[in-house]
Amino acid sequence: MKENTLRKTREALLMSKAELARAAKVSPITISRIENGLPCRMETKRKIILALGLKISDKDKIFHD
C-alpha cells in the first residue's frame, strides 16, 4: 500500500477531515475515501490541494497517480 501523503499533510497542518472537507467544499466521506487509497476526480484533487494552501504544481507531492 502506498504511503498516504494526504493524511500526513492534513495532520501536519492540524486539520481534521471535516475541516479539510469544508475548506475544499467536498464531503468528509470523500476525504476518507482518498486517504484510504481510492481514486478521485482531478477537480476534487484541485480543490483539496488549494484547501491545503498548496499550489497546483504540488499535486505530485500529495497525489501519487
Give the role of each language-model region.
Residues K25-C40:
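Recognition helix of helix-turn-helix/homeodomain-like DNA-binding domains
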Residues I62-D65:
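A short, Lys/Arg-enriched interface patch at domain edges and termini
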